[in-house]
């Protein structure tokens, strides 16, 4: 999967993003 959080974000619309440390609140 492509990086869903670059740059790091506190919220990501993609379901898989919540599993990435950079996207966790």
UniProtKB/Swiss-Prot annotation:
Can you cite an annotated GO cellular component? extracellular region
Tissues and organs where the protein is expressed, per its UniProt entry: Expressed by the venom duct.
Stretches assigned to coiled coil: none
- Disulfide bridge map: 4-17, 5-22, 12-23
Protein localization: Secreted
Residues that the record marks as modified (4-hydroxyproline) are 2-3, 7-8, 13, 15, 21
The record's misc note reads: Negative results: has no or very low potency for Kv1.1/KCNA1, Kv1.3/KCNA3, Kv1.4/KCNA4, Kv1.5/KCNA5, Kv1.6/KCNA6, Kv7.2/KCNQ2-Kv7.3/KCNQ3, and KCa1.1/KCNMA1.
Q: What does this protein do?
A: Kappa-conotoxins inhibits voltage-gated potassium channels. This toxin dose-dependently and reversibly inhibits the Kv1.2/KCNA2 channel in mammalia. Does not exert protective effect on cardiac tissue when administered after an ischemic event.
Family stated for the protein in its record: Belongs to the conotoxin M superfamily.
Domain notes, please? The cysteine framework is III (CC-C-C-CC).
Name the UniProt record assigns to this protein: Kappa-conotoxin RIIIJ
The organism's lineage? Eukaryota, Metazoa, Spiralia, Lophotrochozoa, Mollusca
């Amino acid at each position: 999967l492509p990086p869903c959080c670059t740059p790091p974000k506190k919220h990501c619309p993609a379901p898989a993003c919540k599993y990435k440390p950079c996207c966790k609140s």
